């Protein structure tokens, strides 16, 4: 957008000579013409333009009386598309999935009843370091501080409960209830989300969205962020200390962590991998951020449930570089990783810790890796060790005709579907482990929610990711228990012409909970899942459903979904035995159960 600075034309001299007095020889100072406010000069218009400039072209919304006027202004922006969702939780999950692809997402809900419904999704985005802009239509600005009791509140004159909840799961909160500083509040909120890679909360009073104001009268200066820079001396000191440590090591390795995304350092990480010759592994939540066709890629490091032979190489190394790791009870398999801090170089997005010793701050991850790549001594010892012990993975037995389908046989066929034109969304549960074993072709997307692990996340995330990346076909793997939490927004996928392939794995319960701690509460009511989706479809839009029980039926379903139904949303219910789980889930579940069951420390 062009930026117009001031009413310059109104200040020109009345003669043609620059700097000369007017022809009547009396010099006068003329005021700039007053700014005229129009329907273009509104808060809603400013917010919509800012969203587009930040990279958002779709917002996920649920209407409510406090946000209706704001939604009018958002849909009036020609470059912004409104995606109406069935509930606020899914709108938040969709913004999460969208941010994973686009780098930023946005959702719009109404005050408190909508805000507290979307809160769980925003907490998940916070845990996963995703910049999601959560916009809430708030009460009329005249109601603040009046002791009035409003609807959509808990019935107290103080209606700040929503704000206080969001303060714990967002990095910035803007309550816009006057127009004087609204411009600054909105800009600061969006800038903070992008800088911190965390969600922000913006509440906009319902009577302000359409109100013209001089601060919005001109197109804003195009949105931009000042690039962050490393401290030169700190960078040099960090590189020197790291080189001294690495050059003494015999068999160093590299492990990519999920904060590679936050730091935007995947390319720099690969530059170091190319230069060093070290084996290259990823933590489970990093899958998809590092190309698996790299010549030194050895798989997923996940402790006892790692890719075969990966943990042996990582845990036997005498030096490991971890790039943006997150160590929690899930990623550490119940705190059972065999790692030593004194062997680790931990590279955070903005600091480096060398061998549990000195910390070097104000050092950006990408700068650090690029500088290290220029000077590191090549050492392929650990990768050579990997090649010596590596044995190709066996293939599962093929199902006999009429034999019930096994999950491991199913994923052999899923592997053949993957390409640079697909993306994988893995729901919390056994899909985590089965999808981790897929070998991703270059350019194939991959997402799952490792830190927060909220079941049902994948339905909304599939909606958002597919909307952000229409050129890819999303393959989504969802358990029946998870699907029952958020099933409604299949409707939104159909409504918006999406063409994802959803594999609903029906094993009759919450399988991941079964393997941690079993009980009757983990058994769920079986649904007619294809019948449900057919009812949601209701003949409007393109949708195809099928049930499969045998391998030959799965092969036929995949063929149909990828040929004659390639332009439709495809829903494939895969019916498997309730005890058909991956060996990795069995191992992981027992270790997490042991961690959960630790007795209290003695007092």
Swiss-Prot record:
PROSITE patterns in UniProt: TPP_ENZYMES (PS00187)
Source organism superkingdom: Eukaryota
Induction and repression of expression: By abscisic acid (ABA), salt and osmotic stress. Not induced by anoxia.
EC identifiers of the protein: 4.1.1.1
Keyword Cell wall biogenesis/degradation included in the entry's annotation: no
Amino-acid positions noted as binding Mg(2+) in the UniProt annotation, renumbered to this chain: 480, 507, 509
Keywords noted in UniProt: Decarboxylase, Lyase, Magnesium, Metal-binding, Pyruvate, Stress response, Thiamine pyrophosphate
Membrane-traversing stretches: none
Tissues and organs where the protein is expressed, per its UniProt entry: Expressed in shoots and at lowe levels in roots, flowers and siliques.
Any GO molecular function: pyruvate decarboxylase activity
Cofactor note: Binds 1 metal ion per subunit.
UniProt-annotated stretches for the region Thiamine pyrophosphate binding: 430-512
Requisite cofactors: a metal cation; thiamine diphosphate
Catalytic activity of the protein: a 2-oxocarboxylate + H(+) = an aldehyde + CO2
Family: Belongs to the TPP enzyme family.
Protein name: Pyruvate decarboxylase 4
UniProt source species: Arabidopsis thaliana
